[in-house]
């Protein structure tokens, strides 16, 4: 199996700084709450922000918290743009195992995000190079990512970038380890 993966490109430091902050939490619920706090603050401070969103088991609790806050009237996603991290090649977006479906089930169908502002790699485009270029252009056209949510897999993979992969910039395809396929 192969997945299209976007790795944010470094931009001029005057334009954007990249900060990685490790926050220790006592458990999954605490992590979900704290991560939702960070995302909520970003949406409130910059209503037209670009969120880089992840899939898999890690963010489900985060998305539940964001939906709760939306339902309570605390968050407005109407101006938010999303650029998702990855998608399985060969799966149409309507397939229940696609990450398009995952994101709709867990977040998009429950908040007021504009469907025109939802971006994921196209898993049905079998011209991998063209799809990677197209998705990089989408990300450039929205001004880059303001906040990127990532999960770390049980084997250390991040956004389908396996531990042994070279850290290339931009959207690219990777071959997934069997363990990653089974876990996802």
Regions found by a protein language model. Give the residues of each.
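Short, Lys/Arg-enriched N-terminal segments with co-localized hydrophobic residues
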Residues: 8-19
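Class I SAM-dependent methyltransferase SAM-binding "motif I" and its flanking Rossmann-like core
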Residues: 159-184
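Ligand-binding beta-strand-loop-alpha-helix segment within the catalytic cores
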Residues: 75-148
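A glycine-rich beta-strand to alpha-helix segment
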Residues: 49, 57-62, 138-163
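Glycine-rich N-terminal segment of FAD-binding domains in flavoprotein oxidoreductases
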Residues: 45-71
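N-terminal glycine-/serine-/threonine-rich phosphate-binding loop
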Residues: 18-51, 129
């Amino acid at each position: 199996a192969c997945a299209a993966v976007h790795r944010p490109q470094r931009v001029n430091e005057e334009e954007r700084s990249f900060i990685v902050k490790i926050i220790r939490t006592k458990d999954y619920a605490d992590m979900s709450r704290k991560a939702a706090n960070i995302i909520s603050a970003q949406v409130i401070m910059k209503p037209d922000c670009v969120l880089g969103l992840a899939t898999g088991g890690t963010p489900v609790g985060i998305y539940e918290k964001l939906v709760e806050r939306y339902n309570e009237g605390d968050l407005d996603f109407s101006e938010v743009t999303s650029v998702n991290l990855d998608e399985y090649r060969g799966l149409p977006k309507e397939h229940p195992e696609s990450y398009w479906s995952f994101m709709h089930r867990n977040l998009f169908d429950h908040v007021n995000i504009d469907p025109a502002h939802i971006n994921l790699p196209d898993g049905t485009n079998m011209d991998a190079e063209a799809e990677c270029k197209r998705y990089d252009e989408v990300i450039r056209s929205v001004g880059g990512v303001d906040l990127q949510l990532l999960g770390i897999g049980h084997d250390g993979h991040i956004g389908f970038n396996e531990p042994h992969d070279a850290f290339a910039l931009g959207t690219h395809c990777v071959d997934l380890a069997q363990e990653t396929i089974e876990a996802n």
